[in-house]
């Protein structure tokens, strides 16, 4: 019995030692990156990647590649091209959720490449695409291939990445974010609030802006403005037309799906984050269809959403600030009488929203940001 206890203690000590060493190794990469020792950090990442491959550890492989790419960006001139290749190579060896996240990271790398070499994409518009893009072709595409891709081809690649990522939908919904927060490129607020990896992937699908490209979307926006700009419940009730050719409709469908998924979430911060993302996207859309009717619906929608958070002061303050920001006055020396009167009305509205923020959430970041907004607006 004594021998068994000794053996068990030795085994536990060995496991803890190995675990601590692993934690230390990841911390070492982070420290090297923070100190600007990018080459050393990259080499450490490659070392951990080889170790993870030997063990068949899917998550460690993804983590090593991701951290290695961060390090490479600090000193490699063609780090974007290398990132595309790294994720293409690692995806087939990953499993489940790790593979989903890798697909979203590949889509980010492809976006970076497209944006960096936009002039090539413009020249490639006349390039004839010989065959539809598939996952196999996407993972096998060389950098030479990418130089000949049109903007439409990159959009197809992004769509394929997202569809492949969501193939693990059940696993994503059941997995807590935890350590994956560190692996996903996105805004800090979203990473902190998002409760599942399903949201991580969905968040990547929803852009910060949506540009209208066809009459169908513009008509939809106008005819269903109360639902599109309304509360989460109103937005969910909207029947979107099925049109796979419309990129904007596809985006709206994914946004609606995410809203529906969290409709009964008791965490106000999570719901508010999703509503904020939705209204941000809708704000860009109404900006593309610049009519007073749509702008009015947008403002009314924001007001309804703000009221829906009456039991969550901080979240309500966020939407009130959005309203205040929208009502910033713009008066110039040469502005006419009508313009001045209109802008003064906006200024009065802005003050009302800011006053309410101070009343319901005086210690919130929105109260502080509101003070700065007021100073900018009144002392330009």
Where are these regions (language model features)?
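Extracytoplasmic/secretory-pathway proteins
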Residues: 22-380
């Amino acid at each position: 019995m004594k021998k068994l206890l000794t053996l068990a203690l030795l085994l536990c000590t060995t496991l803890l030692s190995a675990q601590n060493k692993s934690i230390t190794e990841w911390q070492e990469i982070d420290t090297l990156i923070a100190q600007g020792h990018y080459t050393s950090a990259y080499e450490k990442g490659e070392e951990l990647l080889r170790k993870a491959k030997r063990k068949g550890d899917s998550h460690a492989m993804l983590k090593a590649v991701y951290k290695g790419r961060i390090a490479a960006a600090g000193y490699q001139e063609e780090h974007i091209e290398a990132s595309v290749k790294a994720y293409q190579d690692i995806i087939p060896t990953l499993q489940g959720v790790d593979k989903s996240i890798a697909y979203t990271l590949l889509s980010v790398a492809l976006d970076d490449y497209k944006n960096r070499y936009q002039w090539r994409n413009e020249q490639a518009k006349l390039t004839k695409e010989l065959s539809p893009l598939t996952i196999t072709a996407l993972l096998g595409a060389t950098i030479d291939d990418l130089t000949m891709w049109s903007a439409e081809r990159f959009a197809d690649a992004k769509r394929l990445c997202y569809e492949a990522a969501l193939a693990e939908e059940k696993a994503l919904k059941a997995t807590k974010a935890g350590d994956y927060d560190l692996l996903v490129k996105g805004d800090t607020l979203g990473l902190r609030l998002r409760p599942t990896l399903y949201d991580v992937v969905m968040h990547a699908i929803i852009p910060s802006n949506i540009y209208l490209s066809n009459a169908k979307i513009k008509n939809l926006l106008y005819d269903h403005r109360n639902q599109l700009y309304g509360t989460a419940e109103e937005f969910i009730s909207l029947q979107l037309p099925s049109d796979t050719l419309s990129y904007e409709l596809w985006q709206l469908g994914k946004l609606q799906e995410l809203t529906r998924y969290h409709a009964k979430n008791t965490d106000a911060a999570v719901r508010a984050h999703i509503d904020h993302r939705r209204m941000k996207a809708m704000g860009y859309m109404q900006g593309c269809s610049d009519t007073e009717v749509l702008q009015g619906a947008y403002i009314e929608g924001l007001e309804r959403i703000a009221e829906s958070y009456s039991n969550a002061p901080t979240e309500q303050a966020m939407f009130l600030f959005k309203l205040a920001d929208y009502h910033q006055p713009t008066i110039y020396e040469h502005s006419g009488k009508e313009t001045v009167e209109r802008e003064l009305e906006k200024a009065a509205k802005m003050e009302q929203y800011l006053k309410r923020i101070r009343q319901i959430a005086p210690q919130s970041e929105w109260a502080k940001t509101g003070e700065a907004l007021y100073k900018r607006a009144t002392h330009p």
